[in-house]
Amino acid sequence: MAKAKFERTKPHVNIGTIGHVDHGKTTLTAAITKVLHDKYPDLNEASAFDQIDNAPEEKARGITINISHVEYQTEKRHYAHVDAPGHADYIKNMITGAAQMDGAILVVAATDGPMPQTREHVLLARQVGVPYILVALNKSDMVDDEELLELVEMEVRELLSSQDFDGDNAPVVRVSALKALEGDAEWGKTVADLMDAVDESIPDPVRETEKPFLMPVEDVFTITGRGTVVTGRVERGVINVNEDVEIVGIKDTTTKTTVTGVEMFRKLLDQGQAGDNVGLLVRGVKREDVERGQVVVKPGTTTPHTEFEGSVYILSKDEGGRHTPFFNNYRPQFYFRTTDVTGVVTLPEGTEMVMPGDNTDISVKLIQPVAMDEGLRFAIREGGRTVGAGRVTKIIK
């Protein structure tokens, strides 16, 4: 069968299944692919449970994660769906951002109600900035008591509201992933209803090209007779020839300049956009004024900071991480985008030490300023070896 061309005509949305172990995240993922395959056979292939459950390993910021990606389409949208089978994999994926989510389906078994990992996943989704959650009340075929179902639904709504999600209005859809997967028409319809709710309730994501321009500097060199060129991959936004930019971070001063040329693969372009590897010719800037680790940005949109709070995952010994815990005033390097900057760690009150394999919140004071916004990911390294990963949750200074 010929592979269908990736249509850019539909909005593309990244989603994932989250929730307590054995509540049916992977079964639901398989059921969604089956139901959508039956409904729109030319748009979708069905993925078997085993295909999704035997998740391949992937590396993100030096951390190995087992994670499954499936894709499917509804009438309105193209979806990329991630399912991290293991609890630790889920935590690592959320913190490293291996697979970012525009929204999540929280799977809660009607037979159990919200469990400890349900709470932890919702808390983590809030910390890492998942914008929207809706609920699949799974295994609803196993609960005959309507009042019990209503009670579980109420508990889930309260849990969402407690983490600042819209618990009052979030869709809660009663499904049976297993029955839908077995081909039961009535329960299959509930999964179709769930996807209608996903279509309706998860907002269209803002495309990277629509955000303000930012390019991390990877390299700087001089072209005789033309001036200084900074190279890198455009992280977001668009840059046009003759636009003003600022080069910020690492140094104490901000350099203001104008982009007089954009090159890609030795060809001159009118513009570079998110995802492009480009060289920017910058006017009146000396080579020594710019270094790797800085960022080129639309003026006034990004500022450098030295103090922040972050949510981090520390690698276990088996994952190639530290063999010993670390304490207050730990001084590793924080790798932001293209460079390492040393920082001093302060642990939360009441935490004496952090063990390999833990996830925790920390405060960090960097020795050089780094251009950052809330949500920026980083790796924690010791002498070039990754020992953890994290995400900026709050900028202090």
From Swiss-Prot:
Short name of one Pfam family:
GTP_EFTU_D3
Record carries keyword Disulfide bond: no
Which residues are recorded as binding Mg(2+)?
A: T26
Q: Where is this region: G3?
A: 83-86
Q: Might you give the EC number(s) for this enzyme? A: 3.6.5.3
Task: Give the residues the record marks as binding GTP.
Answer: 19-26, 83-87, 138-141
| Region (G5) residue spans | 176-178
Catalyzed reactions: GTP + H2O = GDP + phosphate + H(+)
User: What PANTHER family does this protein map onto?
Assistant: ELONGATION FACTOR TU, MITOCHONDRIAL (PTHR43721:SF22), ELONGATION FACTOR TU-RELATED (PTHR43721)
This chain's function reads: GTP hydrolase that promotes the GTP-dependent binding of aminoacyl-tRNA to the A-site of ribosomes during protein biosynthesis.
Q: Which HAMAP family match?
A: EF_Tu_B
The molecule here is called Elongation factor Tu
